UniProtKB/Swiss-Prot annotation:
This is ATP-dependent Clp protease proteolytic subunit 3. It comes from the Bacteria. Belongs to the peptidase S14 family. NCBIfam families: PRK00277.1, PRK12553.1. Disulfide bonds: none annotated. CDD domains: S14_ClpP_2. The gene is clpP3.
Amino acid sequence: MLGGGAPRARHVLPNIVERTSRGEYSMDPYSKLLKERIVFLGVQIDDVSANDVMAQLLFLESEDPDRDISIYINSPGGSFTSLTAIYDTMQFVRPDISTICMGQAASAAAVLLAAGTPGKRFALENSRILIHQPSAQGEGQSSDIEIQAREILRVRALQETMLARHTGRTETEIRRDTERDKIFSADEAEEYGLIDEVIMSRKAARLLSARSA
C-alpha cells in the first residue's frame, strides 16, 4: 500500500465554543461534526474505529431515522472484519448514508465509500481511491494454514460481491481488477462506479443529494 500508514489526529484538538441562550459550552471538532450528522473516518479501520463509527451511526438513527447521515472518509483501509461490521451497520440503519472521500479511501475504506446510498456517493477533486484483494498471513500447523486459506478465499469472494453490488461491475471484473492494487483518481472512480459524482464544494454535494432523493 502506498502512503505513510494510518493518519493520526493531533493529541490535542482545539475546542469549539458555542454560545446559546443557556450560556457557552465547548466541544471538540468531532462532536461538532456529529451534531451536524457527520461521521468522520480519518484513521485506519480496526475494531476500535469500527465501534466508534457504528455507535455514531446508531445514535444518529435514534435521533432522527429520516435524516441523512454523512460519512467523510480519509482512511488507508484496514481489517476486513472491521469493514464488514461498519458495512452491515450502514445497510442496517434507516437513514440514507452519504459517503464522501476527502484525501484517500483505500482498501476497506474504498468498499465503505462505494457502499453509500446510490446517488449520494462523492469524492473531492483530488481524492485517491484504491481497491485490492484482502490480505492475510497463514501461520501455524498445516491444518491451521488450510483453514486460513479457505477463509482467505471466502473473504475475497465476499469483498468481490460487495464491490460488484455497489459498482455495477461483475464479480469477474472485480476479481481481475483486484489481483493487484488498482488506483483511481476521483474521475476514474466515478467512471468505475465507486462513486456517483466528483464534487468541489459542499453546495454541489447538497444539490446532487437533493436531486437523487
